[in-house]
């Protein structure tokens, strides 16, 4: 007589049948493994070389080996694949024009942390209709990343969990940890194992110490629970990431992109730290996208005067300016090339901002020659 199955029909071990477990879980759906998705949507040789080049350039800039400025620019979040690819083609052309002064990486954010609730990004809800088809979201995200990098444009993204990078990180050149998660041990551990530079934003209250601490923590080896490329739970051991840096994004205490704030930030950084990046949006724009060019003017003045600590900037930009709510009819009712999360500057303004920034870099070279 054969033994009875160890697991009940609902998948729970029989020894736990009396336990109150998963009482708030409504259900589980199968999730494709990272390995399967990477086989189904393989990276092209051009895509992989683009990702590697973007990483090398970013590392050289934040460590002071390259005197250009690293620029992370693009939509607050991507919801429209066609618009994202049109934006990328425009940005690639501008990147080629300004490559002597700027190393441009497209901001390609697919997951959004929310203060309370709201649309959480292309991976979580690709159809923007609360169907949460995450498998479709991962497929769309990977195909988009292959397409963007295949035109020779490096991309950067926000890191929100320890699972999604397994699907996409081979195509990424830059990672960001947001203000809400900089203090999280999980995200510091994640950053310690990523194969590209990672920027930690200062806290939402404007304090810098959490980002400085995060960089130091991520530089060390860590051990934590994760998943393998085949989707198997595993203990992950990381090497440590020495290419982490602080992003100044402002906060409740005010902005922190001016010369005084930059000097104070420099004073807080331990010896040997990587350079600073300034986020033109969020607290530094007082959440008004029209202030981003004003932030750029102040940053350009500092760079033109010889400030070498500013090694990067982050800009929220789209084809068309502003943002929009999600209408009742969903994606069909959305305006083309307009953000559905944070408001962004439009393309024409983006060109002006980046050309001014490139000119400031050229002026810094002249100042530093003296």
UniProtKB/Swiss-Prot annotation:
GO annotations of cellular component type: cytoplasm; nucleus
Induction info: By amino acid starvation.
Regulation: Inhibited by tyrosine.
Root EC class: transferase
Assigned keywords, A-Z: Acetylation, Amino-acid biosynthesis, Aromatic amino acid biosynthesis, Stress response, Transferase
Similarity comment text for this entry: Belongs to the class-I DAHP synthase family.
Descriptive protein name: Phospho-2-dehydro-3-deoxyheptonate aldolase, tyrosine-inhibited
Annotated organism of origin: Saccharomyces cerevisiae (strain ATCC 204508 / S288c)
Top-level taxonomy: Eukaryota, Fungi, Dikarya, Ascomycota, Saccharomycotina
């Amino acid at each position: 007589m054969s033994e009875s199955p160890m697991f009940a029909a609902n998948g729970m071990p029989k020894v736990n049948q009396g336990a109150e477990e998963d009482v708030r879980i409504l259900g589980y759906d199968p999730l494709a493994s990272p390995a399967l998705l990477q086989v189904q949507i393989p990276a092209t040789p051009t895509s992989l070389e683009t990702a590697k080049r973007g990483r090398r350039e970013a590392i050289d800039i934040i460590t002071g080996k390259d005197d250009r400025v690293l620029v992370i620019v693009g939509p607050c979040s991507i919801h429209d694949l066609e618009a994202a690819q049109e934006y990328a083609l425009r940005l690639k052309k501008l990147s080629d024009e300004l490559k002597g002064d700027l190393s441009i990486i497209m901001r390609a954010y697919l997951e959004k942390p929310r203060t309370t609730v709201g649309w959480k990004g292309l991976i979580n809800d690709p159809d923007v209709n609360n169907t949460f088809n995450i498998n479709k979201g991962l497929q769309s995200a990977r195909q988009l990343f292959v397409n963007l990098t295949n035109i020779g444009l490096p991309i950067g993204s926000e890191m929100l969990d320890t699972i999604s990078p397994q699907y996409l990180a081979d195509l990424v050149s830059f990672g960001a940890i947001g203000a809400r998660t900089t203090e999280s041990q999980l995200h510091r551990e994640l950053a310690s194992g990523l194969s590209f530079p990672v920027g930690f934003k200062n806290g939402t209250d404007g304090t810098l110490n959490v980002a400085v601490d995060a960089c130091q923590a991520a530089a060390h080896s860590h051990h934590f629970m994760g998943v393998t490329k085949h989707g198997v739970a595993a203990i992950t051991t990381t090497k440590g990431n020495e290419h982490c840096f602080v992003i100044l994004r402002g906060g409740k205490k005010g902005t922190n992109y001016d010369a005084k704030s930059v000097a104070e930030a420099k004073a807080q950084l331990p010896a040997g730290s990587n350079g600073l990046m300034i986020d033109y949006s969020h607290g530094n724009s007082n959440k008004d996208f029209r202030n981003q060019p004003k932030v750029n003017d102040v940053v350009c003045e500092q760079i033109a005067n010889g400030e070498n600590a500013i090694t990067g900037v982050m800009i929220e930009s789209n084809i068309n300016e502003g943002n929009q709510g999600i209408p009742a009819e969903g994606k069909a009712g959305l305006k083309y090339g307009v953000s559905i999360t944070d408001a962004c500057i439009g393309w024409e303004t983006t060109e002006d901002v980046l050309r001014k920034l490139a000119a400031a870099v050229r002026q810094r070279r002249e100042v530093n020659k003296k």
